[in-house]
Amino acid sequence: MATNMPTAVERTPHNPFAARSPEDERLHRKQRLAVAFRIFGRLGFDEGVAGHITARDPLRDDCFWVNPFGMSFKQIRVADLLLVDHHGEVVEGSWPVNQAAFAIHSQVHAARPDVVAAAHSHSLHGKAFSSLHRPL
């Protein structure tokens, strides 16, 4: 027998899959990006100043959000994030952009419009394993 019972997602007071305005989606991505940095930092994926995570901007498809150069992953807040265009110009934010982050992530986002986010890190364990020159 078919029932018209609402699904678990439909019963959730805030449906995370509900359509959002582009502005709300921007804030959502920035919040999740800041959380991702904190998680990466807590797990030890922020060795030195190397490493970056980006999220495509839903309002401007030629831009992405990225961490500022030299800031610990463990300290990054939404207000610290930089909006960078595909020419390397900081559109929003007052920190310097990591040029390596721009070089890597601008190419990923340009080549793969279906990709919303990308991460690159230099974890202690990753560097140790790579020094062994063994395939995964």
State what each model feature region is.
Residues 2-136:
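Glycine-rich flexible loops
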